[in-house]
Amino acid sequence: MRVKWLRKAIRNLDAEADYIAEENAVAAAEMFLYVKAKVDALGDFPATGRPGRIPNTRELVIDHYHFVVPYRVVGDEVQVLRVFHTRRKLPKVW
């Protein structure tokens, strides 16, 4: 399956990396690559995430960096909707 990052998801991940980079650019790059690799694996294992809070979505939990990545499967595509840090209040809609 193809993994497609929606614009909001890309902006979310970039913002998290920018925040970390203020203190440590190497750690920010490592986080970015780690999250991207975990999300890209959804192309092979789309049912990896738990059922989502929003109907017709799933959520990949990335414990190492405290992220929740909501996504949905549409046809032969995994659509990455957002990237959220678990210590922040999650929005009601993705």
Identify what each model region corresponds to.
Residues 62, 67-68, 72-94:
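Enriched for short, Lys/Arg-rich terminal
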Residues 2-57, 74:
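Basic, Lys/Arg-enriched alpha-helical interface segments
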